[in-house]
């Protein structure tokens, strides 16, 4: 289950990083109740917890649904994540988002499990579009010479690399855009 979840949601752009966990039993060794999405196996299926948090402001996740079959579990996670992505503020963790959401976990449960807003199919379709179009950006960087040239060739060398050019902006340096790079190299 954990591998399926990881593969399904990899590369998902969200207001803040998303942490997930799957525990195979109620001993909860993977600490699923401290994650944004936590899944715990039961004798009848899966329990789904959401909006947990560790770190500076720890918060136990809230139980969203119990004894779910795998298909329903994935549908609820799809809906939850897409609803969070659509409605959360930039850099807002799921735990803070839930605290600020009028109606709290009951509202989320109504939207995700009972489809109270009538957007469940749309949220699932949005997630499926993400899954279907996922492309590993690092693999693309390695396989595309133009992108690969943007990375430093020798990490343990002080020798200059003509592929890496910086320009000054507001008292700091930043990587040059392609047209700026050409101008800098021509003037050097």
Regions found by a protein language model. Give the residues of each.
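Peripheral terminal and linker regions in Fe-S/redox and tRNA-modifying enzymes
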Residues: 1-188
């Amino acid at each position: 289950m954990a591998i399926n979840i990881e593969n399904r949601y990899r590369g998902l752009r969200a207001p803040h990083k998303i942490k997930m966990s799957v525990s195979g039993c109620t001993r909860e060794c993977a600490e699923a109740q401290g994650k944004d999405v936590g899944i715990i196996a039961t004798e009848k299926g899966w329990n789904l917890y959401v909006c947990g948090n560790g770190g500076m402001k720890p918060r136990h996740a809230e139980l969203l649904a119990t004894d779910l079959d795998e298909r329903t579990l994935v549908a609820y996670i799809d809906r939850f994540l897409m609803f969070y992505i659509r409605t959360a503020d930039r850099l807002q963790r799921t735990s803070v988002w839930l605290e600020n959401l009028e109606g709290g976990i009951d509202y989320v449960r109504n939207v995700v499990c009972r489809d109270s807003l009538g957007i469940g199919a749309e949220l699932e379709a949005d997630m499926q579009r993400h899954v279907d179009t996922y492309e590993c950006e690092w693999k693309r960087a390695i396989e595309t010479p133009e992108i690969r040239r943007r990375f430093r060739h020798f990490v343990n060398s002080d020798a200059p690399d003509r592929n890496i050019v910086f320009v000054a902006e507001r008292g700091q340096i930043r990587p040059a855009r392609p047209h700026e790079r050409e101008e800098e190299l021509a003037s050097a």
